[in-house]
């Protein structure tokens, strides 16, 4: 990942969460996500300045649920999956990556002093009882085949048991950090 990714990730998460909490009277919308992302860009720039690190970056994926509406936004290669028991996979975010000399390069992310690359893709969905939403980093989805990931998401087991399976597979297969 990016330099100081954990620091950048915490700054972005805290800024978006704070913006959402401070604006509960504003309905979820593309504009609300964009404004939260601007706050996150400012936060990562300030954190970079405070720590004398010119460069730090992170990806982001989020969901906000109001009633039966889910607003999903992401920047980078962190993903959101939306599955419905009767229909399977309804939606998966599209990674913001390009291949450069055989390497995957994240083309959009929160990166210090580069707010122009922190442009989120935003989608809204009507959700139903029983729908499953998974937010995860590339360290999780690259650790298992897509059919295994989806099967675990639709499993009737308690959430903790499903997360234990994800944790086991990531530790066994993965060489990347995961959330």
Descriptions of predicted regions:
Residues 1-179:
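PP2C/PPM-type serine/threonine phosphatase catalytic domain
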